[in-house]
Structures are given as structure tokens and as C-alpha cells.
């Protein structure tokens, strides 16, 4: 019994040993039987697998390193990956890739030399192995670039790039072509067709309406309906038929000239109408501002008399910084005051004088009562209650050759009475109400004006956004004007001006202003407004300030650079496109809007928004 069991164990162990040794012997014999050609076929299959999976490996590597990629680098590579040219900001990475490519080329040359002494079958195997090694070297080069945060892009031919650029640029060519055909068709319809061609005219009208419905207000080709190409072809056929119906070319040329003249006249009329509407919008008070003024005026008269006055301050202290603005606009005067105070390094030394008329005095007073300025002092003055203007001044203003209420306003010319309005002051800075202060103006008070009366930024350089010449405002054909003044003299701008009131009083320039103003009204020697008569009154009395103190041109399309605006101490919205009007220029409005409290309840109720 024990003998039987022993034989069973021996048999089982023998079978186990045979099952282990048999595969080893079989595989070794199989490997020995593989010929060189079979080995070449095997390597070729392996190389094909490597080539097929190369792009997949590259994409997988990019996905794994995607979070580290911040900016794509430019790459130019061949389709068969025989060469790789990489644009990288790192010289070190470039040297690494180039050295790898050089080693690779040397390796390939050595292999080629060795293959010359081998049989053809072995050379085939070597070539396949070389291609596989080439692919491996390229993959290693890509790994290096991926480590340097370089993104690989699939190669694109030159024709593909040109096509892509053309598609990006020509996004409205089809729309323009359709509109040209419509214009051409309408021109033919306006011409008298010879003979009996009613069918052609009918077809042309139908095609025109079809294209007009297809295009509508479309400006891009991608928004055109799919039927537009067919309709365009039908229009071209109709235009060809119509063109063959005309034989009298001189008559057609005459008709087209008449149509051109009519179109030009219509364009000129449209321009005149647009200019008139712009001027009308500039002179009209916006509904929101009118609502705000009415609400503030009503609230002002509901207050007790003793509560209507601002706290009395040192309004006549000559050691403080005095600023003045003449305005009938609540928001405009508020922006001037707020921007000046917020930009100042010493707001407690600022005294702001806001001069207005009787109509707007309650509203402006109520606004500053509701919105105190903090440490700065504010004084609201009514020009109609001050006995500084001559009794006949209003009559002189009405004689100006202008219907613009802004020009004939008493506030516009009250600036020429500054020494009389502020008899206790020696210096003062005058603002127009369409300015915004962006820098501290303390340095102005320490300027030595060398005996001049007014400090201003000059505007006599051609190409300057605020360029003006004397002869464009003043009639130098008059003998008296040409003898006393120089037409080539440098002009200067209002907006922000520093006045030496002591020197003004000494030279009695207010009397000079009244004399010149009366002469100008009687003889029509210059354009209406305060600027021409101001140039003549202060002729030879101007101290030039640096340009950065006052940058103008924000009230019209002047092409100002953003850097010039942001570096300016004061920006001036000279022109009709004021920032509080709907016609204001959006890119310039933002400098004004930041000083307007649009969250204020009164502005919300009057629908005044940013």
C-alpha cells in the first residue's frame, strides 16, 4: 500500500516538472527558428505601432502637463517628424534640443555606413530600427519641451494658414456684394427702359425685394440665410438681362450724373440736419437735470430762512486757496467742487466760490446743504444780487450776433469782473463748469507770474486738440484790429486759469474789457462769446502754464491719448458734447462720472444714471 502511494507521488511530481520544463524548451526552439527576415517583419510591425501611437502619446503628455502650461510657444515641425524647430525663450532648452538632434544625425550616419557592408535583408532591419530610434529621439525632444511648458500644435500648411486669415478678414464680403447688387438694381430701375421691357423690370423688382428681405440689417456673412447664394445668382441673371436692354450709353451717363448730384444733395442736407440737432441737444437742458433742479428748489423753499445758509467760513482770507466757478448746472458745479477737494492734499485750506444766477441759486444752495464738502469751505453767490455788473451790461450781451443762450448769458461774461466780485482777494483760480480736477493744484499758488495777469495753457500749436488761431475768431481785416493786435499771436484756453487780481486792478483791465466788448458788438469785429474778447483784453498779459495743467478736447472728437488725459491736472470738456448730455463721448464720460453720486435719492428719482 505504501509502495503504491510512493509511485503516485513520483508520477505527480514528474508531471509537474514536465509542465514547467516543456514550455521553456518549446519557446527556446521557436526563437531559434526565427529568421532574419521574420525578425525584420516583427520590428516593422513594432515600428508601425510606435508611429501610430506617437500622436496619442504626445496628446497624453500634453493633457498631463496641461495645468502647468501658461502660454503656448511657437512650433514648426514636419509631417514625418524628421525635424523639429522650436521657438522658446530659454536658450538652454534650445541647445538641449539641438544637441539631441545632432547626436541623432551622427547616430543615423553611423548606422548608414554600417549598413553598406550588410546583406539587404539586414539593411532592411537596420533601417526599420533606425526609424524607430528616430521616433524615440523625437518623443524625448518633445518631453524636454513639455518640461519647459511648451505646447505642441499640429502642423499646418501655408495654404491652410492663408485660407484661415482670409476667412477671418472676409466676414462681410458676401453682404457687401449683395448690397452692391441692390444698389445697382435700384439704379437700373430709376432709368427709363427703352421699348417694352415690363417683364424685365418686374423680375428685377422681385429680385431686389428678395435680397433686401434676405439681408435686412445683417452685417456678417454668417448671419445670412442659406438661400442667399441662390438669390444672389438670380439677381445677377436679372441684372445681365437689364444691361442688355440698354443701348444708348450717353443717355444713361447723363441720367447717372443727375442721380449722383441728387444723392450728394441729400447727403449734404442730412449733415446739416445732424449738425443742427447736435447744437439743439447741446443747448437743451436734459429732462433729468431739470427734474433735479425742480426738486431741489422745492425742497429749498420748504426750509426755514435761517437753515438756508451754509455755515459762515473765512471766505475772504487771502492766505487760503480760493477757487471760483460760474455755473447754472447743479451736477456740473458739484463735480468741479468734489473733484478739486478730493484731489487736494490740503482740503482744509480750500475755499470754493460757486457763482450762479437767481433762477438756479436755490437748487445749487440746496444741493450743497444736503451734500457738505467736509473740511473745505463753500460759498454760494447770486450774481444778480451783486452790484458789480453795469446796468447796461445785459443790453450789450443781447446785441451779440448769437442766439445761443450759453453765449449771451451773464454768467459767461461775469469772469471779467473778478476783482470787483472778490475785492479782498489777491489771487484766484477760475474754473469752467465743464472741467474735472485730477491732481493737487497747490503748486499753482507758488508760481511767479512775472507781472502777468492770467496764467493759462497755450493753444497755438497746430495739431493740438484745442488748437485755435486768432484770425479764426477775430476780423483782422479791420484797420484798428490789425494795427493793435498780431494775428499770429499765441492763443490760450479757458477752463482753468490763475488770475493775479492785484495786477488786474492796477492795469484796470475790466475797463479795457468793456471798451473792447462795446467795439466788437458795434463793428462785428469778432465772434460772439467770451474767448475772443478775453484774448484781446489780456493781450500781452498771459503767463504760459505747462500743458499738463489743463488738457482740453474732451467735448469733441479730438483723438486725445488716454495717457495725456490721465496725467493732466485738469481735463476740460470744451465743445458741445458735454459729459452730462446724451451726446457726450462715452470714452471721456467716465472721468466725469466717478465724481457724480448716482446713488443719491434725488438722482434716482429723476432717473439720472451712469
Curated annotation (Swiss-Prot):
Compartments (UniProt record): Golgi apparatus membrane
Keyword field contains Membrane: yes
Transmembrane region(s): 7-27
Residue numbers on the Cytoplasmic membrane side: 1-6
Glycosylated residue positions: 88, 94, 196, 338, 401, 475
Skewed-composition ranges (Basic and acidic residues): 110-123, 139-170
Lumenal compartment spans: 28-610
UniProt keyword terms in alphabetical order: Cell wall biogenesis/degradation, Glycoprotein, Glycosyltransferase, Golgi apparatus, Membrane, Signal-anchor, Transferase, Transmembrane, Transmembrane helix
Signal peptide: none
Main location: Golgi
Assigned protein family: Belongs to the glycosyltransferase 8 family.
Gene: GAUT5
Gene disruption phenotype: No changes in the cell wall content.
Entry membrane topology: Single-pass type II membrane protein
Listed name of the protein: Probable galacturonosyltransferase 5
One Pfam family here: Glyco_transf_8
GO BP term (any one): cell wall organization
Tissue: Expressed in roots, inflorescences, siliques, leaves and stems.
Region annotation Disordered: where it falls in the sequence: 86-170
Any one GO molecular function term: polygalacturonate 4-alpha-galacturonosyltransferase activity
Function per UniProt: May be involved in pectin and/or xylans biosynthesis in cell walls.
Pathway the protein acts in: Glycan metabolism; pectin biosynthesis
Organism: Arabidopsis thaliana
Gene3D superfamilies: Spore Coat Polysaccharide Biosynthesis Protein SpsA, Chain A
Organism placement in taxonomy: Eukaryota, Viridiplantae, Streptophyta, Embryophyta, Tracheophyta
Enzyme Commission no: 2.4.1.-
Disulfide bridge positions per record: none
Annotated Polar residues bias: 86-101, 124-135
GO CC annotations, alphabetized: Golgi apparatus; Golgi membrane
Amino acid at each position: 500500500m505504501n509502495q503504491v502511494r510512493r509511485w503516485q507521488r513520483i508520477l505527480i511530481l514528474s508531471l509537474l516538472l514536465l509542465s514547467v520544463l516543456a514550455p521553456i524548451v518549446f519557446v527556446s526552439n521557436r526563437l531559434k527558428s526565427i529568421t532574419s527576415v521574420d525578425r525584420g517583419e516583427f520590428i516593422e510591425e513594432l515600428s508601425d505601432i510606435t508611429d501610430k501611437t506617437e500622436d496619442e502619446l504626445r496628446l497624453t503628455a500634453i493633457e498631463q502637463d496641461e495645468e502647468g502650461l501658461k502660454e503656448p510657444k511657437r512650433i514648426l515641425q514636419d509631417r514625418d517628424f524628421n525635424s523639429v524647430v522650436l521657438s522658446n525663450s530659454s536658450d538652454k532648452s534650445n541647445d538641449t534640443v539641438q544637441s539631441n538632434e545632432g547626436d541623432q544625425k551622427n547616430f543615423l550616419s553611423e548606422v548608414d555606413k554600417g549598413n553598406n557592408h550588410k546583406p539587404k535583408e539586414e539593411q532592411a532591419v537596420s533601417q526599420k530600427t533606425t526609424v524607430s530610434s528616430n521616433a524615440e529621439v523625437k518623443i524625448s525632444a518633445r518631453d524636454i519641451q513639455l518640461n519647459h511648458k511648451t505646447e505642441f500644435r499640429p502642423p499646418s500648411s501655408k495654404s491652410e494658414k492663408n485660407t484661415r486669415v482670409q476667412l477671418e478678414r472676409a466676414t462681410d464680403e458676401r453682404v457687401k456684394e449683395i448690397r452692391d447688387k441692390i444698389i445697382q438694381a435700384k439704379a437700373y430701375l430709376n432709368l427709363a427702359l427703352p421699348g417694352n421691357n415690363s417683364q424685365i423690370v418686374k423680375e428685377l423688382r422681385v429680385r431686389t425685394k428678395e435680397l433686401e428681405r434676405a439681408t435686412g440689417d445683417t452685417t456678417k456673412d454668417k448671419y445670412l440665410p442659406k438661400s442667399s447664394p441662390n438669390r444672389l445668382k438670380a439677381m445677377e441673371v436679372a441684372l445681365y438681362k437689364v444691361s442688355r436692354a440698354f443701348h444708348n450709353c450717353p443717355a444713361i451717363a447723363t441720367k447717372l450724373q443727375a442721380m449722383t448730384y441728387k444723392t450728394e444733395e441729400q447727403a449734404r442736407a442730412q449733415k446739416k440736419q445732424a449738425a443742427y440737432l447736435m447744437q439743439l441737444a447741446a443747448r437743451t437742458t436734459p429732462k433729468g437735470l431739470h427734474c433735479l433742479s425742480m426738486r431741489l428748489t422745492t425742497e429749498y423753499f420748504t426750509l426755514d430762512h435761517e437753515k438756508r445758509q451754509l455755515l459762515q467760513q473765512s471766505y475772504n482770507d487771502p492766505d487760503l486757496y480760493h477757487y471760483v466757478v460760474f455755473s447754472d448746472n447743479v451736477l456740473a458745479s458739484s463735480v468741479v467742487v468734489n473733484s478739486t477737494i478730493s484731489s487736494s492734499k490740503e482740503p482744509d485750506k480750500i475755499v470754493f466760490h460757486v457763482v450762479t444766477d437767481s433762477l438756479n441759486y436755490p437748487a445749487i444752495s440746496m444741493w450743497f446743504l444736503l451734500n457738505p464738502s467736509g473740511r473745505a469751505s463753500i460759498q454760494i453767490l447770486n450774481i444778480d444780487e451783486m452790484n458789480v455788473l453795469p446796468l447796461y451790461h445785459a443790453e450789450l450781451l443781447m446785441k451779440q450776433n448769437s442766439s445761443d443762450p450759453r453765449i449771451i448769458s451773464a454768467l459767461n461774461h461775469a469772469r471779467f469782473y473778478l476783482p470787483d466780485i472778490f475785492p479782498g482777494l489777491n489771487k484766484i483760480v477760475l474754473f469752467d463748469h465743464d472741467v474735472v480736477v485730477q491732481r493737487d493744484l497747490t503748486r499753482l499758488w507758488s508760481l511767479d507770474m512775472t507781472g502777468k495777469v492770467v496764467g493759462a495753457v497755450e493753444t497755438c500749436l497746430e495739431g493740438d486738440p484745442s488748437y485755435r488761431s486768432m484770425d479764426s475768431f477775430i476780423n483782422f481785416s479791420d484797420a484798428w484790429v490789425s494795427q493793435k493786435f498780431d494775428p499770429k499771436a499765441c492763443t490760450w484756453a479757458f477752463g482753468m486759469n490763475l488770475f493775479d487780481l492785484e495786477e488786474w486792478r492796477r492795469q484796470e483791465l475790466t475797463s479795457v474789457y468793456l471798451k473792447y466788448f462795446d467795439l466788437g458788438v458795434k463793428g462785428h469785429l469778432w465772434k460772439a462769446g467770451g474767448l475772443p474778447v478775453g484774448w484781446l483784453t489780456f493781450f500781452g498779459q498771459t503767463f504760459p502754464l505747462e500743458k499738463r495743467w489743463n488738457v482740453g478736447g474732451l467735448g469733441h472728437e479730438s483723438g486725445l491719448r488716454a495717457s495725456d488725459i490721465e496725467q493732466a491736472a485738469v481735463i476740460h470738456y470744451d465743445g458741445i458734447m458735454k459729459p452730462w448730455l446724451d451726446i457726450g463721448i462715452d470714452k471721456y464720460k467716465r472721468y466725469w462720472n466717478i465724481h457724480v453720486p448716482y446713488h443719491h435719492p434725488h438722482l434716482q428719482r429723476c432717473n439720472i444714471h451712469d
